[in-house]
Amino acid sequence: MTLRPLALAAALLACTLAFPNMAATAKQPASAPAHAEDGIAWFKGDVDTAFAYAKKHNKPLFLYWGAVWCPPCNQVKSTVFNRQGFIERSRFFVPVHIDGDSPSAQKLGARFKVRGYPTMILFSPDGNEITRLPGEVDSERYLQVLELGMSAGHSVKDTLVLAQSDSSKLTPEDWRLLAYYSWDEDEGQIVAAKALPATLQKLAAACPPGDTGVHLGLSALVAAATAEPANQPATDKAAANALLLRVLNDAKLARDNMDILTNYAGDIAGYASAAGTPERARLTETFNAALEKLADDTSLSKADRIAAVDAKVAIARLDAPQGPLAPALVEEVKQRVALADRETTDLYERQSVINNAGHTLTDAGLLDESDTLLKSELKRSHSPYYYMLSLAANAKKRGDNTAALDWYEQAYGASKGPATRLQWGANYLANLIDLAPADDKRIEKTADSIIGELAGTQNAFYERNRTALEKIGKKMTTWNAGGAHDAVFKRIRQEFQGVCDKLPASDPQKATCAAVM
């Protein structure tokens, strides 16, 4: 799915953490608030049993995994899973909810090739993946895409093969299945990441004219704008500019594609126009007008409306990233954030709304206001440790390394769940090395804590856990370059090796563990 590119490093960590277990699939951690989706009969049992049940009863299987703290997950719970339309449809498939901190989570992540939170996959009754659903679209569009997947004659993978061999054979439904596939969560299953921009560009060019083609065209533009330069296909910038103007000037098209317009405003506007040109001026003016309408659109979720305001900030910073914003825009940010804060009472929804609001304040240069909002939420949130990462990032942005490390430490200390604690700990340790490299004692103490918990974590060397540990290994190796911290480094490495030694020789995790340090 397409998640907005959050400005704070905390959020970048946030939506890409661990994945679920087996036996406790239908259970939330004790710290979670009451279910917003109580009407859904989540399957009680492990994943393999769920697939067997789906096959026996000839039902598709809907697999959702997320985390208690994850803002986009809470957004889905408060805008999709609590909808009567979704609850009614859930009776026609086997719904499986896997919590990200359950013991087999990372191993499942490797099995299903998933990383980001939330990921939602629809499988056929025989266990083949049909599609990955985009969690960033509004609830009505989500239900339409879900219905499309349930009635699809073939998978997105097979549909793509057909599109690449003879696109004339695709039906309008086939094109919609491709257009609304969660390409950001593909993880290279269908298309290698490097090839995605060019692939989407070709699909957009082949798609018949209409709303589906517009969405594919915008998706291709996002992929190109956010790709590494070496992976960017040749793009007709004038055509890209024209596509954006067409969408922005059409209220329905803008509303239908609000996820792209709000999440990637700065990226696509910057890619489709050059700084200081009349084309840039016209595009940004038109963008602002469309975003203003989206921010006022009460049919959108509060989180999406705040995202539209943040997009206005991104547009304003296109040509002057560090410059002051117009006073009117600064005042608008303050007022819209205050309104969203007052009007959002649901705890699930607040986790997403306050996250967006905090980032919007930060992006607007209102660090003190962002801190005030986030600190207030610490008392209210079911997962305050998530917001502590944002507070750390704000302090880091100010250049206050002491305060930043204090918040990273608090976040690690307050975090819950084995996968979450490992990732929060890795983040804290990485920042310690960056911001206080001479503090050997604190670095060793933190590493000892992480390794101590690691020894009791099942499947600790799969997927996101593995990525976090590899990050630690690289950081510490660089930190000790030339033997600058050799005594501490050797003690930490020896302690880590003790974890590796306890793994059975036949366990594939053993080689991964040995390579970390």
Where are these regions (language model features)?
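Alpha-helical repeat scaffolds
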Residues: 159-163, 190-207, 231-252, 264, ...
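Generic helix N-cap/helix-start motif at coil->alpha-helix transitions
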Residues: 169-175, 209-220, 253-268, 299-317, ...
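Conserved redox-active cysteine motifs that mediate thiol-disulfide chemistry
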Residues: 65-80
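Non-catalytic, surface beta->alpha helical segment in thiol-disulfide oxidoreductase systems
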Residues: 114-156
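Structural micro-motif
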Residues: 59-61, 106, 110-122
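Residue at a conserved register position within TPR or TPR-like alpha-solenoid repeats
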Residues: 316, 361, 395, 432-433, ...
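Thiol-based oxidoreductase modules, predominantly thioredoxin-like and allied folds used
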Residues: 40-45, 65-66, 83-105
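Structural motif corresponding to the intra-repeat A-B loop/turn of tetratricopeptide repeats
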Residues: 364, 398, 435-437
